[in-house]
Amino acid sequence: MKNNFVSAHRNAPLTAKILSAAKLNKRMRRMEIYYDEWESPIGPLLVLACEKGIIRIDYGRMKDLKDEISAWLLKNGAEPIFIKDSNQTNQAKKELEQYFKGELRKFAMQLHLFGTPFQKKVWQALLDDIPHGQTKSYQDIAYTIGNPKAVRAVGGAVNRNPVAIVVPCHRVIGKNGKLIGYNGGLDKKEFLLKHEGFLN
């Protein structure tokens, strides 16, 4: 089975890239998952990767999130073997540090995301169509993906985004302009939008 390589912002050199996870075999497979964690201006960040790219960025620490992440991987057909290895996550850490310093507006790290085709379509739209310093509503995203009636489903996909900050679900706001629905908490959403210059 070939992996579909989708480059976000195809004409821009410094943008995140999604490497879609292949369809999973019925038989569970073991997968080495590399991780690292560090303190950021927004609190502790946990980055996880497989050999093909970054699979998750979470707010928090491995000791608190390991069970949740293990269950998520098992649901996606992978039995995780967790290995603390900063070499595998170093590029992501560097880019995130540059982002928080205001030196990076588009991420280049390679992503390997687990999700349904619809979810990946929504996540790709977030990467392609909401640049740094801008926001869109859930309805806007539904129109972008060619399914204007799927606002609720878009909300569900945004809520399940596994890669915080890089896949910018924090840039999706309510139709009325209010900050709603962010897994990291509205305080983090507000912090990120202020950092990007959308909010004062």
Language-model-detected regions and their locations in the chain:
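A generic hydrophobic-helix recognition signal that picks specific residues
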Residues: 36, 161-163
